[in-house]
């Protein structure tokens, strides 16, 4: 076996979390205790054999080695200088149907997982999604300004922010944002 003792647990955690979520476990605040109990049992260990999963990774080289092994085992790659432009292009396309930055992030996570790319950190993905969403919004605003007169734009805005008749007293815009 490549890993011995408690190192097997670290490698197993990396493998299971990457395969299940597309992220390395250090991207999470913690591991579910049920998962940890299952893995220690499956490996013939006791949960008390380790103080914590973080104690396995006092040495960063060990964590890197486990992450690399898990990526190779499940066929995932990291987002790098080659794949980042592809992700940016995908975000541009996905932003046309996204209703918010959070929605775009969720769509991009699926896109990455489908292509077997490790999901980057939240900040990286959020910054890229925010940029793509803003570009889409700016294109939509430019299209409206090209096709509608200032008077028509003002009338549409007035209607969108007007109170809707009926219960709740919401604006038309709030009503439109409410899921069915």
Please provide the spans of the model-predicted regions.
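Long amphipathic alpha-helical coiled-coil/heptad-repeat bundle
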Residues: 1-180
């Amino acid at each position: 076996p490549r890993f011995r003792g408690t190192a097997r647990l670290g490698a197993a955690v990396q493998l299971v979390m990457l395969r299940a979520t597309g992220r390395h476990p250090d991207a999470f605040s913690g591991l579910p205790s049920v998962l940890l109990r299952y893995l220690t049992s499956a490996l013939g260990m006791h949960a008390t054999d380790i103080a914590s999963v973080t104690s396995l990774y006092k040495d960063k080289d060990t964590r890197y080695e486990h992450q690399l092994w898990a990526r190779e085992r499940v066929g995932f790659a990291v987002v790098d200088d080659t794949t980042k432009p592809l992700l940016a292009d995908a975000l541009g396309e996905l932003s046309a149907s996204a209703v918010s930055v959070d929605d775009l992030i969720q769509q991009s996570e699926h896109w990455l997982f489908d292509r077997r790319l490790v999901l980057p950190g939240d900040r990286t993905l959020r910054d890229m999604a925010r940029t793509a969403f803003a570009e889409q919004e700016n294109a939509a605003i430019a299209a409206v300004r090209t096709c509608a007169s200032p008077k028509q734009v003002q009338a549409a805005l007035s209607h969108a922010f007007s109170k809707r008749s009926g219960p709740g007293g919401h604006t038309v815009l709030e009503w439109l944002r409410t899921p069915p």
